């Protein structure tokens, strides 16, 4: 596997020097300063490449080229936004970048309720609390019809949770959910968020699938022409939230995506933390079934709690993800590709590390502090080395 590292550009507290010292060789980044829907100029791409190359690294994967909301809702200037997206792909390919990670989650990117969940050892993790989220939906956002998405017990727990909140607690929870986490290109106020939700009135799972299919039928032929591989990231959490449909959450969704535009360029990001939140997602089976379409991997683990929809980020080798078996399945796919003449390793990045040690005293991007990811990368690297020595000695 190619060892890569997510970097949020010049404003990231983690520097490219840090990335190199962590042992990564590839950088996963994006042009975050360019507004959603606009073309990424070749000059801007090359400038970012030069910054990365100056530190002895390479820009391996784009994460992400954001998809404008009007594409997802199939409204407004969606065709123009798609044309701009196509041109961005051409420009990236012209610069030699050939993997693009993206997602099709409505409105919000990945979602958490607690960005500073303290673990028993004193480190901090990200957490999604189903009851806290219910309290937000029912009593802060006050989304009409939200009660249908929760059991009577969850509604009662959410009411008790909300009643115990201070104004500061309410502001913090609201900000955590709608203000935009790292990688999300847009944040909202409550009123803006309500207006954005209203744009999805009448868009169910079938309609969102059709909107994504329209996008893919326009994008994948361009990717084929320029030799670029698209890698869709799963929903996080992998289920409907806020009354919004989610369509990249299960192995059935992966099959639908494959069949919708059946091209090797229409592929997946295997994010074990996102898919792994669901106990019914068999990660190894997913890799074995769609191995030739997996162009990028995010390796992390989560820990499901008493409420099966509540989880927190675990250590990379702890939690509900069997990282040993996952890495073995990825290496099996790499071996198959190399036997067929494709010597390119599959890019992997350690996802979401715990905030720990010296990083507890620094301002960091939630989930993206240096030391926790350094630990995760070292652990996954060790698993990979042991597996290669034991089962895959011929792998490069």
From Swiss-Prot:
The keyword ATP-binding does not apply. Keywords: Iron, Lyase, Manganese. SUPFAM superfamilies: Xylose isomerase-like. GO terms for biological process: D-glucuronate catabolic process. Its cofactor is Fe(2+); Mn(2+). It catalyses: D-mannonate = 2-dehydro-3-deoxy-D-gluconate + H2O. The keyword NAD does not apply. It is an enzyme of class 4 (lyase). One of its GO terms (molecular function) is ferrous iron binding. Pathway: Carbohydrate metabolism; pentose and glucuronate interconversion. Its EC number is 4.2.1.8. It holds the Pfam family UxuA. Transmembrane segments: none annotated. Catalyzes the dehydration of D-mannonate. Belongs to the mannonate dehydratase family. HAMAP family: UxuA. This is Mannonate dehydratase.
């Amino acid at each position: 596997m190619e060892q890569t590292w997510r970097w949020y550009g010049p404003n990231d507290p983690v520097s490219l020097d840090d990335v190199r010292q962590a042992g990564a060789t590839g950088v996963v980044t994006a042009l975050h300063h360019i507004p959603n829907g606009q073309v990424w100029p070749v000059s801007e791409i090359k400038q970012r490449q030069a910054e990365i190359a100056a530190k002895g690294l390479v820009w391996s994967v784009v994460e992400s080229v954001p998809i404008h909301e009007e594409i997802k809702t199939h409204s407004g200037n969606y065709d123009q936004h798609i044309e701009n997206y196509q041109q961005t792909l051409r420009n990236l390919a012209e610069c030699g970048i050939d993997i693009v990670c993206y997602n099709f989650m409505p409105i919000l990117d990945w979602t958490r309720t607690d960005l500073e969940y303290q673990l028993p050892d004193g480190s901090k993790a990200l957490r999604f609390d189903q009851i806290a989220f219910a309290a937000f939906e029912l009593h802060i956002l006050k989304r009409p019809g939200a009660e249908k998405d929760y059991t009577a017990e969850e509604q009662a727990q959410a009411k008790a949770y909300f009643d115990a909140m201070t104004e500061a607690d309410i502001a913090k929870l609201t900000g955590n959910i709608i203000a935009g986490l790292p990688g999300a290109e847009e944040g909202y106020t409550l009123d803006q968020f309500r207006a954005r939700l209203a744009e999805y009135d009448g868009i169910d799972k079938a309609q969102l699938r059709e909107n994504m299919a329209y996008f893919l039928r326009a994008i994948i032929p361009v990717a084929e022409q320029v030799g670029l591989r698209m890698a869709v990231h799963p929903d996080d959490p992998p289920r409907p939230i806020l009354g919004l449909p989610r369509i990249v959450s299960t192995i059935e969704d992966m099959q639908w995506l494959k069949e919708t535009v059946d091209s090797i360029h229409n592929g997946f990001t295997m994010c074990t933390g996102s898919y792994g939140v669901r106990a019914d997602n068999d990660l190894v089976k997913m890799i074995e079934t769609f191995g030739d379409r997996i162009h990028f991997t995010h390796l992390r683990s989560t820990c499901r709690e008493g409420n099966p929809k509540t989880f927190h980020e675990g250590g990379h080798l702890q939690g509900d993800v069997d990282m040993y078996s996952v890495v073995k399945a990825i290496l099996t796919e790499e071996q198959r590709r190399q036997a067929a003449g494709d010597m390119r390793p599959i890019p992997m990045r350690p996802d979401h590390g715990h905030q720990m040690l010296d990083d507890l005293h620094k301002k960091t991007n939630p989930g993206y502090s240096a030391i926790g990811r350094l630990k995760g990368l070292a652990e996954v690297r060790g698993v990979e080395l042991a597996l290669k020595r034991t089962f895959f000695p011929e792998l490069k």
